[in-house]
Amino acid sequence: MKDLPARRLLLVHAHPDDESINNGATMARYAAEGAHVTLVTCTLGEEGEVIPPALARLTADRDDALGPHRVGELAAAMRELGVDDHRFLGGAGRYRDSGMMGAEQNGRPGSFWSTSVDEAAAHLVEVIREVRPQVLVTYDPDGGYGHPDHIQAHRVAMRAADLAADPAYGSDAPHTVAKVYWNRVERAAAEAGFERLRTTAPGAFPGIASVDDVPGVTDREHITAEIDGSAYAGAKSAAMRAHATQIAVDGPFFALSNDLGQPLLTTECYQLVRGVPGVPEGERESDLFAGLPPATDGTGAAGAPSATGAANPADAEGGAA
């Protein structure tokens, strides 16, 4: 791939729809601003539940056709966000959705959870060295809420960032990602969103979720970047609607298959865990590329320091492997 824009953003997610819920406004904003946005999705989401009754036959325990259907949903969502570069890790269907933690699907041959981290990371290294992103976004060590595929996506993304920077690994030119972020949701913002839901649309869904049900929710001191995506609220909402088997959207609120309403947030928050902050200590970045040269090739310096001050990136992620 040649002649890419100066700014290049890579996002690594577990299933189709995760990108739109977590980063839809961010992706739409950077795509509109001319950055090259690459999404890597690790599975097809075959084990998901299905909201529309007319599509109930797609589930894994019936026709087992949900994965291919969600490929189409993801393509539609990417059109809404203006993102042209989407890949499935290792190719579509290479790794299967592992189901929720403790499910028998966790250990199924070919499931993402049962796959060696280094094996899966090798495919992501290829993408990193091809696209040469300055910024990588993925989950925290818990995957946001403990789903095995989210945890594995975190491990694979962090490992791939290490391997891609290692000149001794593989034959392609190494590349160091300058900044690595984890998805976060500020607790206070989530609480305010739930209060709006309770006061303005209490009957929009059969029930209302709790703040602690929101993946990646954390206190304000862990938030280092805040992306204002309000101008792209429509694009994010449309992308989420495209994932119709998984998400029901009602104005500024949505629900998953559990029918529990929650706020659709267009200010998206992140925690910088590798790289140098682009703002003074105590301030929040408003741009994930803050502090980077405007036309860098993104190679960065080997062993870019962790924003948490950890010499070993594993220390910054709670020792996750």
Curated annotation (Swiss-Prot):
Cofactor(s) in the UniProt record: Zn(2+)
GO molecular function, one term: N-acetylglucosaminylinositol deacetylase activity
Reactions catalysed: 1D-myo-inositol 2-acetamido-2-deoxy-alpha-D-glucopyranoside + H2O = 1D-myo-inositol 2-amino-2-deoxy-alpha-D-glucopyranoside + acetate
The organism's place on the tree of life at top rank: Bacteria
GO biological process entries: mycothiol biosynthetic process
Gene3D superfamilies cross-referenced by the UniProt entry: LmbE-like
UniProt keyword annotations, A-Z: Hydrolase, Metal-binding, Zinc
EC number: 3.5.1.103
Entries under InterPro entries matching the protein: GlcNAc_PI_deacetylase-related (IPR003737), LmbE-like_dom_sf (IPR024078), Mycothiol_biosynthesis_MshB (IPR017810)
One Pfam match: PIG-L
Cysteine disulfide links: none
Residues that coordinate or bind Zn(2+): 15, 18, 150
Bias kind Low complexity: ranges: 290-321
Disordered, as annotated region: 280-321
Co-factor binding comment: Binds 1 zinc ion per subunit.
Functional summary from the UniProt entry: Catalyzes the deacetylation of 1D-myo-inositol 2-acetamido-2-deoxy-alpha-D-glucopyranoside (GlcNAc-Ins) in the mycothiol biosynthesis pathway.
Family: Belongs to the MshB deacetylase family.
HAMAP family noted in UniProt: MshB
Protein name: 1D-myo-inositol 2-acetamido-2-deoxy-alpha-D-glucopyranoside deacetylase
Source species: Streptomyces griseus subsp. griseus (strain JCM 4626 / CBS 651.72 / NBRC 13350 / KCC S-0626 / ISP 5235)
Gene: mshB
